[in-house]
């Protein structure tokens, strides 16, 4: 029975899944959007939304200690100081008044080689 099994496993064991989510999140921070399979897009959306929430909280933090702690948590997930700075200093200020929903998934059709359903996941930026 699969009661209460909410985790998106995406066909990988734990450390491989963690690495995949980390790499996809890094690409979203670096490029703003990526095209990947739909199950991976749904899994990385959950992971990335939590990172964005931490980045927004770090930007809103009134104490320097709280901001540093949140930046360290983001660094633990991304593993690159340059990307942490970009996420907190450049991307997060655009979402200070937003209560979540930082990304959107758009289906783009099947992949040519094997027919896997592909999706575009991108940051939602309001003008």
Curated annotation (Swiss-Prot):
Domain of life: Bacteria
Record field: transmembrane: none
Metal-binding among keywords: no
GO molecular function annotation: structural constituent of ribosome
GO annotation terms (biological process): translation
InterPro entries (alphabetical): Ribosomal_bL17 (IPR000456), Ribosomal_bL17_sf (IPR036373)
Keyword entries, A-Z: Ribonucleoprotein, Ribosomal protein
Cellular component GO terms, alphabetical: cytosolic large ribosomal subunit
Family under the similarity heading: Belongs to the bacterial ribosomal protein bL17 family.
Subunit record text: Part of the 50S ribosomal subunit. Contacts protein L32.
Protein's name in the database: Large ribosomal subunit protein bL17
Native source organism of the sequence: Thermosipho africanus (strain TCF52B)
Gene: rplQ
